[in-house]
């Protein structure tokens, strides 16, 4: 079927779509076969009614079928957030990814430019000297040689160009804000996944379970799409096919609580400078929150069993220079420097 109208009519009637219907509808959207008005109407009908797990699974399946893939080790992990929390923090998941790579776990980092902040992962890494517009072979080399590779979302999900203008005109959150982090071009099955609202914790854990993920922690920390050190982090953890919910506090990581102002960053250049300060030994709130996210990622990856063991290994990665070396190698390989 190449006509969105039947799916639009069903969504407008507040009826949920089946997985197959959602996949078919999003195939149409991402193949350029729907008009801007149809795209906007369909996305808002889903948003107002509330997207279901089956609809998200179907949409992700469609998106994954069209993406440019990257070969990565089976045990690779992604540390990624939906964005959209409007917090303007430092690039926490970026530094956490480098720490995890330095600790010996391969990272296939998926990200984009800023959504609601001044600096997304792509902005931050570009300011650090990482080349973004590279092909799958170079990214695979980055993961193999640096321990971490960056997949620039817009290069791997070119089908999104068909819905981009409608999303901009709508100017509000749609299901597409959720789909990117769920559609890793490297097909990772282990993730630390931050979400902009706690309402999505369990639903997205269910989505990842149904899509075959092994271990995923979906997290929301005190308004952030990260594990936070400003207060309580809510977690829905998918492990061995089961989902459990729990909370984490700064004390669980052995760090002192901070306030949002302590981790608020600037643009890509400013955040790159802050990241390099931590690599050079700065002991501050940015270091603490990045270590916390890295520690959880090391648990998810199966590298350690406990958060505290994860903190120890993450700190060793930073303090030994292994994290800085991972960044140096990522810059060199992405720029194809021997």
From Swiss-Prot:
Q: Which GO terms describe its cellular component?
A: cytosol
Which cofactors, by name? Mg(2+)
Which residues hold Mg(2+) 1?
Answer: 93, 226
* Binding locations of anthranilate 1: 81, 112
An example of a GO molecular function for this protein is: anthranilate phosphoribosyltransferase activity
Query: Which chemical reaction does it catalyze?
Result: N-(5-phospho-beta-D-ribosyl)anthranilate + diphosphate = 5-phospho-alpha-D-ribose 1-diphosphate + anthranilate
| Complex formation | Homodimer.
State the protein's purpose. Catalyzes the transfer of the phosphoribosyl group of 5-phosphorylribose-1-pyrophosphate (PRPP) to anthranilate to yield N-(5'-phosphoribosyl)-anthranilate (PRA).
Protein name per the record: Anthranilate phosphoribosyltransferase
Which gene name does the record give? trpD
